Amino acid sequence: MSKKENIIGNKNRTQKYNNACLTRSDVYALVKETINKRKHDGEFCNITAHIFDEGFEQQKEYIREKLSTASIVTDCRQNRKRLALHRKKIESIFNIHTSLQEEFNSCSRRYNGSPNLE
């Protein structure tokens, strides 16, 4: 593969590994659709709970139940990102028990080797 091909991207590789990348937008869409579906079904208990609230556990349980069949529509209707492949990543996102500042500091240290940024 030429350097230019690598910079631009390899279309076949991108299509082959499209399910390998879970974006923040995908997680947001999953949570938003979970809320919409639960409201549609008349399940209003803790529907507005934040991810750090205890009530968000009901959202997580609903997502866990549906994850094996859940998908996100990507660039066209024929391409869907199957979320069951990302179960571990989704669980780790939902189990963050820190403030945003603590999470930022942790990521900065992990990826940049930076000292604690307070």
Swiss-Prot record:
One of its GO terms (biological process) is viral life cycle. The keyword Transcription applies. It holds the Pfam family Baculo_LEF-11. Keywords: Transcription, Transcription regulation. It comes from the Viruses. Belongs to the baculoviridae LEF-11 family. Involved in late/very late gene activation. This is Late expression factor 11. It comes from Adoxophyes honmai nucleopolyhedrovirus. The gene is LEF-11.
